[in-house]
């Protein structure tokens, strides 16, 4: 009776009024959310500009007081020499900090890599412990590293203005080791992209060529360090986010085993996903700098502040070892066709290693498509992207994430249908779509078990060949801006080692030649799908851009991985600075 009366009331004029009211409310709500997002963009950019102005004024004051300082000579010092001069007193921490502040301000004009000036770095100079391994060293931080009094926005409007109440654990340890964190650097919106753009701070450009992406998600770090604006930085990696920007910007980067360094206090857009491991790692111009950073972080303070981290100090004797290595290698994973420059980089490195007395044997991890399409994609999106999408309510979606957000918003039944229809023509896309559907707790446990079984199978395969380390291609050269988000399959060389949770680092070994670039006309890819076509187009016009190789070791063998990287660096040593 009540329902019929309600229906009668709604069927008349009042029903029309109610419908109009609901529609109006929806429009107003949408407009309000849009205005909120616009306000966040305005505030974020105002703060960014204000911070950069404060940086510049501080630098100008210092230069007026120290007109005879040779900034170029200081900036040219490798990190180990810089540390020696700081600890001996030959250089003051003030001279080093303000010189790098000036360089960071300068290179930011062409790259847009700095999001926030960590203003207390000036007062911290007097507080830094002299005995620390990183005494007086300026360190840049990917924006997700929580820093007291500053926001870690991840390029999302809901995080704008939400300042951290304390430093994350690794930042605390850096300070205890005498380092001076001085800037936050840009990331792609949500950090789930290997490009580097977001609505709050805009696009970061590659220092070697502004029309190219710096990589992501630690793209601001790659651009800043690659252009000489920071001697050392920290990034994170869940699919290649340290390795892409390091490779694209011509620097070195290490993704350690997931739990070797603390993640406590890091900002994320998705919490609780553990199937595919996130790693914290260093980025720098040379491998010795990475090793010094790892040695500094793997100390008693880290193990005290985060008891979930295994108390494994850095093993210097492994890093300094000179025994010949038995190296597995592959030219291709048969999933993403290597560009001519990628293939040449691996083969030239192989030949140099053999000439230096190391043993190189062919090796390819088993069942790579399964690891990528089922395990990695399924692990990252076991909830169908639900947690991820919560971050975008009322926010703008950056173009670098447009395709991903669109796919994740599709209902489960439609993803399944689309996957079925696409499978005959585009099997890779179909497989990824299928894996991005939400799954039950039972299915998630099954997936996690499959990941562990796959990991053990690759370790067994590795040990059966008695390998020390593995040499692989690394995607390169840098792609055009706004291209990485439309070439998802190209993460195959990196995300495999997140799925396996093996330490992996990249070292630049060559640059793209005119012949490499010309041969890209014949590049087809293995599948001929849209990912292959976009990749081909996005990697053209790369003459002179850096190309890296990837060095991999078994879990918890970061020192051996770095030792291998240092050997590759010693043998190859290309020009590392953008011209």
Swiss-Prot record:
Modified residues (Phosphoserine): 241
The keyword Iron is assigned to this record: no
Activation and inhibition: Inhibited the trifluoromethyl compound PF-3845.
Cytoplasmic domain ranges by topology: 30-403, 434-579
PROSITE patterns according to UniProt: AMIDASES
One annotated Gene Ontology cellular component of this protein: postsynapse
TM spans (from-to): 9-29
Subcellular localization, as worded in the UniProt entry: Endoplasmic reticulum membrane; Golgi apparatus membrane
InterPro entries according to UniProt: Amidase_CS (IPR020556), Amidase_dom (IPR023631), AS_sf (IPR036928), Endocannabinoid_amidase (IPR052096)
Name of this protein: Fatty-acid amide hydrolase 1
Gene assigned in the entry: Faah
């Amino acid at each position: 009776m009540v329902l019929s009366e309600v229906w009668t009331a709604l069927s008349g004029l009042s029903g029309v009024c109610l419908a109009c009211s609901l529609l109006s409310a929806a429009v107003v709500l949408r407009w309000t959310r849009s205005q909120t997002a616009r306000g966040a963009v305005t505030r974020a950019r105002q703060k960014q500009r204000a911070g950069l102005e404060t940086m510049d004024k501080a630098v100008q004051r210092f230069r007026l007081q120290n007109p005879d300082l040779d900034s170029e000579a200081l900036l040219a010092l490798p990190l180990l020499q810089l540390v020696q001069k700081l600890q001996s007193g030959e250089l003051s921490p003030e001279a080093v900090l303000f010189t790098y502040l000036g360089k960071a301000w300068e290179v930011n004009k062409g790259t847009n890599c700095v999001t926030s000036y960590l203003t207390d770095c000036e007062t911290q100079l007097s507080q830094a412990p002299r005995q620390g391994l990183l005494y007086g060293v300026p360190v840049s931080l990917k924006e997700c590293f929580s820093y007291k009094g500053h926001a870690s926005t991840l390029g999302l409007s809901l995080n704008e203005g939400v300042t951290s109440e304390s430093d994350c654990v690794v930042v605390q340890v850096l300070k205890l080791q005498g380092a001076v964190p001085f800037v936050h650097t840009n990331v792609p919106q949500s950090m789930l992209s290997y490009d580097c753009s977001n609505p709050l701070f805009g696009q970061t450009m590659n220092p070697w060529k502004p029309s190219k992406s710096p990589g992501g998600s630690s793209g601001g770090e790659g651009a800043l360090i690659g252009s000489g604006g920071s001697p050392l930085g920290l990034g994170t990696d869940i699919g290649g986010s340290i390795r892409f920007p390091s490779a694209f910007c011509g620097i070195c980067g290490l993704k350690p085993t997931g739990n070797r360094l603390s993640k406590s206090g890091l900002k994320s857009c998705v919490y609780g996903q553990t199937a595919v491991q996130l790693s914290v790692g260093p980025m720098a111009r040379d491998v010795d700098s990475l090793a010094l950073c790892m040695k500094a972080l793997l100390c008693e303070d880290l193990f005290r502040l985060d008891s979930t981290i295994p108390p494994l100090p850095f093993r210097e004797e492994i890093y300094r070892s000179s025994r010949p290595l038995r190296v597995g290698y592959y030219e291709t994973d048969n999933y993403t066709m290597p560009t001519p420059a990628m293939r040449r980089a691996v083969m030239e490195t192989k030949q140099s290693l053999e000439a230096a007395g190391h043993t190189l044997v062919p090796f390819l991890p088993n069942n790579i498509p399964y690891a990528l399409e089922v395990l990695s994609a399924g692990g990252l999106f076991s909830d169908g992207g639900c947690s991820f999408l919560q971050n975008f309510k009322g926010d703008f979606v950056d173009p670098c994430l447009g395709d991903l957000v669109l796919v994740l918003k599709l209902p489960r039944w439609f993803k399944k249908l689309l996957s079925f229809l696409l499978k005959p023509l585009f099997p890779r896309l179909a497989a990824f779509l299928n894996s991005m559907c939400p799954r039950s707790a039972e299915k998630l446990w099954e997936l996690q078990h499959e990941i562990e079984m796959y990991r053990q199978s690759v370790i067994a395969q590795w040990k059966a060949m008695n390998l020390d380390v593995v040499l692989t291609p690394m995607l390169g050269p840098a792609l055009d801006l706004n291209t990485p988000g439309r070439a998802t399959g190209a993460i195959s060389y990196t995300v495999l080692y997140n799925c396996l949770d093996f330490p992996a680092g990249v070292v630049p070994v060559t640059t793209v030649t005119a012949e490499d670039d010309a041969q890209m006309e014949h590049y087809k890819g293995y599948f001929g799908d849209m990912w292959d076509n976009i990749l081909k187009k996005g990697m053209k016009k790369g003459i002179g851009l850096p190309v890296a190789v990837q060095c991999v070791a078994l879990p918890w063998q970061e020192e051996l991985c770095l030792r291998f990287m240092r050997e590759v660096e010693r043998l190859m040593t290309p020009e590392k600075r953008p011209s």
